[in-house]
Amino acid sequence: MSGPVPSRVRVYTDVNTHRPREYWDYESHVVEWGNQDDYQLVRKLGRGKYSEVFEAINITNNEKVVVKILKPVKKKKIKREIKILENLRGGPNIITLADIVKDPASRTPALAFEHVNNTDFKQLYQTLTDYDIRFYMYEILKALDYCHSMGIMHRDVKPHNVMIDHEHRKLRLIDWGLAEFYHPGQEYNVRVASRYFKGPELLVDYQMYDYSLDMWSLGCMLASMIFRKEPFFHGHDNYDQLVRIAKVLGTEDLYDYIDKYNIELDPRFNDILGRHSRKRWERFVHSENQHLVSPEALDFLDKLLRYDHQSRLTAREAMEHPYFYTVVKDQARMGSSSMPGGSTPVSSANMMSGISSVPTPSPLGPLAGSPVIAAANPLGMPVPAAAGAQQ
């Protein structure tokens, strides 16, 4: 049997081909390190697979920042994240990388970002109105269209990576640690994204994927928001994840997809996939979520959650969907800038605009006077965890 049929993305296909090599060749990137003594940790916000995250203060200007201390991983991966953040800096709703510092003793790198006064999504999503959901989805699309136009796929779109300051209606797409440059014809690692947001292409081991992976993940977010079902596809493992998807989208279209790309399904699916009809989106509507659902919401969702990655809406096409007409009209009335996606860019100069500066820090117990990373023991300092932080 010959291998899988190749696939090329429909938009922004050759962005990196037309850029100088130094734009995408992150392995050759030379990192410019800042001064770790400029930062003082305040409290731990959470931890992820690859990092620990702290709220901190830049003591040179008393601004709040978020510091992400990277766990030991391949230097190549760290360089990739830094290069991507630098390439995207100033883009609409992209988290701004402010500084890169390193502890001289442990050599642990840390990234300093603009501070966003985030509300935990599990609390926030329960309070959002129909208009709020449209508004924030549109803001995510600005970030996605921008990064895709810059030849970059995020590969980890999920609620945890979307920071929302609801009071100021400010959104930032964060955690670019799994992001990668798109090169047509390149085969990528399918072990990316979080289970509930993994596209079918990842679950069937199709490696020639592209920006459209992010659009599937966005569709999963939209479904969870409008149907108030988090997560929408709740698989117990990666195999069960595809089964959960097939129970909604049906098995017929799944087999059409794997036939089209000549994909060989893992034999483990033989016993668990079964046969399922395609379900109508209306069946997920009930009294508790009907105020968030509209014909245009379901039409938009249907055009994102497609097995065939080539038939999903692109980010730019999505922004032109009727679901966003009211948002677009309101933003036009308010006179958004002409930036791609219609959002004011965040330059390093105005990075902290709109974020009130914090007063001179009072003594923080064991942290008073500590640099961001204690030389001998970068992760061992007793920083109080934030309430509700992911541990």
UniProtKB/Swiss-Prot annotation:
Source superkingdom: Eukaryota
More details: Can use both ATP and GTP as phosphoryl donors. Phosphorylation by casein kinase 2 has been estimated to represent up to one quarter of the eukaryotic phosphoproteome.
Phosphothreonine: modified positions: T344, T360
Family classification: Belongs to the protein kinase superfamily. Ser/Thr protein kinase family. CK2 subfamily.
PANTHER family xrefs: CASEIN KINASE II SUBUNIT ALPHA, CASEIN KINASE II SUBUNIT ALPHA-RELATED
Disulphide linkage map: none
Stored CDD domains: STKc_CK2_alpha
Name of the protein in its database record: Casein kinase II subunit alpha
Location of the Protein kinase domain: 39-324
Its job: Catalytic subunit of a constitutively active serine/threonine-protein kinase complex that phosphorylates a large number of substrates containing acidic residues C-terminal to the phosphorylated serine or threonine. Regulates numerous cellular processes, such as cell cycle progression, apoptosis and transcription, as well as viral infection. May act as a regulatory node which integrates and coordinates numerous signals leading to an appropriate cellular response.
One of the Pfam families matching this protein, by short name: Pkinase
Annotated catalysed reactions: L-seryl-[protein] + ATP = O-phospho-L-seryl-[protein] + ADP + H(+); L-threonyl-[protein] + ATP = O-phospho-L-threonyl-[protein] + ADP + H(+)
Gene source species: Oryctolagus cuniculus (Rabbit)
Enzyme Commission number(s) from the entry: 2.7.11.1
GO CC terms in record: cytosol; nucleus; protein kinase CK2 complex
Phosphoserine found at: S362, S370
